[in-house]
From Swiss-Prot:
Gene behind the chain: lolD
Originating organism: Alcanivorax borkumensis (strain ATCC 700651 / DSM 11573 / NCIMB 13689 / SK2)
Protein name per its UniProtKB record: Lipoprotein-releasing system ATP-binding protein LolD
Any GO BP annotation: lipoprotein localization to membrane
UniProt: ATP binding residues: 44-51
Family the UniProt entry places it in: Belongs to the ABC transporter superfamily. Lipoprotein translocase (TC 3.A.1.125) family.
Annotated keywords: ATP-binding, Cell inner membrane, Cell membrane, Membrane, Nucleotide-binding, Translocase, Transport
Gene Ontology terms for molecular function: ATP binding; ATP hydrolysis activity
CDD domains named in the record: ABC_MJ0796_LolCDE_FtsE
Gene3D superfamilies, alphabetized: P-loop containing nucleotide triphosphate hydrolases
Coiled-coil region(s): none
Keyword Lyase assigned: no
Subunit note: The complex is composed of two ATP-binding proteins (LolD) and two transmembrane proteins (LolC and LolE).
Places the protein is found: Cell inner membrane
EC id: 7.6.2.-
Amino acid sequence: MNNSTPVLQAKKLVKAYEEGDNELEVLRGVELTVNKGDILAIIGASGSGKSTLLNLLGGLDHATRGSVAIAGTSVASLNDRETGRLRNRYLGFVYQFHHLLPEFTALENVAMPLLIRGDKPSDCQARSAEILERVGLGPRLKHKPSALSGGERQRVAIARALVTEPALVMADEPTGNLDERTAAQVQALMIELNEKLGTAFMIVTHDREFAARCPQQYELHDGLLRRL
């Protein structure tokens, strides 16, 4: 992928479900382009289809109509295995709940994507320690999730998303399960990482104040995505 190729591009994206003889369109012709280093927020009411959109853009679900391209490659042209490889190469994911494996340390959780990819264990540990240090958890490498605070667990999840050096991190309500103070810290961290690493961030959030801190803001309403 060269610098002029969008990290992610959606064109005329439609997601519809059958309801008897009718078709219910949850997304209606969504258009979106994400370039290298962008940081954008997507807001919308509960049930507006934000998570559905994120799943389509991340290659985790199939659109009814329209197209999604990751790093210039159309997802529709790939089988599931090829889509997985493309997704793992270019995208990282953060969710409202951290989904850390409780029996493993912070370092081991972050290293997991690299080990699955087949990297050398020594390289995995070094890279994971480096990214945990960057998110402010250097002294907590050997702690298991049960010994970490909610904010620290979410920092580990962010580090895990970043460890493969993705072009884009897709975050679905990443601070929705945190108290106000901790949420503000995690929000500031993502903005800082975007600025320092050049990693693009797409953040789905109900927090309009957080969204306002992102240079690009979109609202999903009635199946349509519009820039604010």
